[in-house]
Structure formats: C-alpha cells, structure tokens
Amino acid sequence: MAGIPHDHYEPKSGLEKWLHKRLPVVALVYDTLMIPTPRNLNWMWIWGIVLTYCLAHMIVTGIVLAMHYTPHVDMAFASVEHIMRDVNGGHMIRYLHANGASLFFFAVYIHIFRGLYYGSYKAPREVTWIVGMIIYLCMMGTAFMGYVLPWGQMSFWGATVITGLFGAIPGIGEPIQTWLLGGPAVDNATLNRFFSLHYLLPFVIAALVAVHIWAFHSTGNNNPTRGEVRRGSKEVVKKDTLPFWPYFVIKDLF
C-alpha cells in the first residue's frame, strides 16, 4: 500500500518462500486485510463489508437461478414458475436474490451518502470515487436487465420504455436502440442479450470492486474528522490506526 508505512508479509516456511517468489498471492491477501485503518471510524464505515457480502450473495444465488432459467420469450416465464414450484428451495433462492438486490441498493446509497458527507470524493481519493460511481452504474444496468428476465407484462414494457430513452438521443439514438434490442422491437434477441449481460456484469462489478479496494488501499481510508493519517514512520502510523483484520472486520460483523 503506497504512501502509508506498514508491516509487510514475510514468508517463513520453505513452501511460503517458494510461492512468494513465484506468485505472491499470500502477500496480496495479507496487505489487503492488514491495511492500517483510522481508529475513529464510526458505523457509517460498515457498509463496505455489507456490500461485499451482498455482491457474493447475488452472484451465488444468481448462478443457481441461471441453472434453471430459459432465456426464450416462450419459456422464460414458465422457467421462473418452474423455479418457484419445482426446484428444491427455488422459491427461497429467488426471493433471496430479489431481496438481496434491494439490500444491495440500500447499502450502496448509504455508502455513497457517507462519501458525500465526509468528502471521500476529494483529493487524494478521486479515483476511488470514480470507480465507485462506475460500479453504481453497472449495478443499475444489471438490476434493470434482471427485472426484464421474468418476461411478464411489466418486464416487456419496462424494456420497451427504458431502451426507448436511448432512441430519443438526436442523431445516434435509433442505431443505439436497435443495437440494444437486437432488432426493431423488444423480442427474443433482446431477452437473450439482457440475460447474457445480466450474467456477465456481476463479474465485471467484482473486478471493479477489486480496483476500488486497491485505490483506497493506496491512499488510505477517509475518516469522520477528514484528517489524514500521519505517515512519518510505522510507529507514528500505529498511533492513528489499527489493522483492518481482526479489529474492524469483527466490529463490522457485530
């Protein structure tokens, strides 16, 4: 983590040293978990770990649902009913996925408000903020396409209205709308595209989350006083901070 003096991973056993020279993945995990974190963080800082849980929750439940879903206009709704009625625990998995999305957005709005209130968008954390906003846009796109997948009346007309917004762009809007729909109107090609992107984007979000974490590990965490951690030496840093693991992980869990 650039800029903040801290203890680095030191391999001890022969196997650890061998792996560290070739693939320092243990050092990466160590530096991620042991980031010096300001001691004065309040409850507004718990939402990052809530969002991490939500993303993992959505990916796992989504993969299970995708095993039973059929992206075809004649079978999509029936496949959702099949999940609800015939798949063991299918109704629970679907509701966990749908309500998990609500928790995801609830947590991300508080996370964004925290950033606005405490100035986390200001230097030196602009990149962290920008990546976070890209994640938010990807979340909105993923949620919208997931809403379309059951292929009921609200799904169909929702897809028609939202894609129609792109058609209103002067000059280039109509080609963009046609490309999004896969044809002149909402149809099977649209459903296939939306399902494919709905499955893909969560993994894009996961990659962006890794970049997001990398960015704030480089600059250090913000805190309620908005004061920067003193960085003269490891001893000085330890007076202002504690390691993220185990102190803040345990605090966030409880």
PLM feature spans:
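Membrane-embedded alpha-helical bundles that constitute the cytochrome b-like, heme-associated redox core
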Residues: 1-254
